[in-house]
Amino acid sequence: RVPGVRQQQAALAERYGLSGFCYYHYWFNGHRLMQRPVEEMLASGKPDFPFMLCWANENWTRAWDGGEQEVLIRQEYSEEDDRAHIRYLLDEVFRDPRYIRVDGKPVFAVYRSALFPDMRRTIEVWREEAAARGAELYLCRVESFNAAGREELAVGFDAAIEFQPFTPVSIVRGGRSSCTTCANCGATAARCAKPITTPTSHTA
């Protein structure tokens, strides 16, 4: 939360070869949590370091496990909220010039896509809202909690991201790897012609 520390973190990351941060994003039917670091970073323009968001779309629980016990804030889904959510991101976050993109498309990751009642429809809604603003999206799903493979991508994601230690292997269009894979060709990031080439580090 301290601006000076964020600057130091970015400098340290750049020094050791990282070229972007992935911030966890908490959205509960319009209610945001732990948003201060991202909001301050957006307002100040500092650090001048690439970033993206990953939506931690699970229940907010006392045990921090995303489960069904001791739920403090429940994660609920609706088409109305899908539209409100992506509009907020398009208007307030994705426009930032530091935001990580692939082929000009802002990259947005979903932590647990298997929890959505209709992930395919949510993706359709997100892309509709982006198109209405003359934009496109590059959507990724995190392979975790035994939800991994080609069938998970088939609902409309562009790529998959491993989340160790929950996924020992990624499976994308018949390809297997131990690193991030590309949905366009199934190759690892090192072999794909148009991969997500920006290494990222997750931060809350």
Task: State what each model feature region is.
Residues R1-A204:
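Glycan-processing catalytic domains of CAZymes
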